[in-house]
Structure formats: C-alpha cells, structure tokens
Amino acid sequence: MILNIHGYGGSAQNSAYTALLSLGCDVTSPQLDYDAVCPEKVLETLREMAVTCHADTLIGTSFGGFFAALLCAELHLPTILVNPCLMPFDILPRLGNTQPIQPLMVLFSKLAAIDSSLVHCIIGAEDEVIGDHAFTKRLLCDADLVQVPNGRHSGATLPLQSYFQTILGK
C-alpha cells in the first residue's frame, strides 16, 4: 500500500496519484486541508493512516513531501519525494498561508533523523515555487535524486509514471 500525500492547495487526485493508479498500484491518498489543520495534527493523522493501512511506501508532493520526509525519518519507510517543500516555514507564507510558522520549524528539526538511503526524489529544474532545491540536494545527498530539465513545480510537468515504474518495479 502506498500513502500518497498531496501538496498545499493540491488534490488527493494529484499527478502522483494518477500515475500510481495507471501502474496498478494500491494507493491511499487523503484530501488534506492544510489551512484548517495545524501541522502537528496533519502529521499525526498521516502517521495513523500509514500504520492503519500498512503503508510500505510513502510519496509526497511539495508540502506533502515535507510530511512524507518526516514520516520517513520516524517510520523508516521507503519514500519518494516529488518537488518537496522541505522548508515550508519559508515557502508557504509566500503562497498565502497565514498559519504561524513556529510549529513548522519545530517539525523541521526532525528532518535531521532522515535516512536518505530510503529516499528517491524527483525535482523540476525550472521549479518556480521552490527554486533550485539547494536544501533538498544537501539534505538528501545520498538519495537517488533526479532533476528533470524544463520540469516545473507541477507534477504534471514531470515524467512521474516512468519514474515511479522504475522505482517501484511495476
């Protein structure tokens, strides 16, 4: 079972979800309201889902990548990050999120425990939201990281189906 976590303002039926379904994967993809629920509660909900549905792989896109990375550090599950927003306390206010950033900063510190050997990551070279992903590259130095020329922030601009197929062996 794959737990797919969408990004800020995104949909449970995002590009990652669509690509996974096309490969015949068993996917759980919750719709999350990041504006209405505090980050700690989002993480708690996702943790419970991962355990309850016996997730064996996590996939997170953008802000969902932040939560997938946190769960990877905690649960030690293989994780695929798609244009991850690993510093949401910096990015989300620029996107209109008005929640306090301190809870995100507390959660951010937990990324230090991530085992990058469990992580695969695909990023767009022309990501207009995150930028050059310099922090992602440094944090995940041992990860399998693919940078897509001309790829933007939207997962629709990335070859997700073939990328997932290679990693998941589908």
Segments predicted by a language model, with ranges:
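Catalytic histidine neighborhood in serine/cysteine hydrolases
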Residues: 140-156
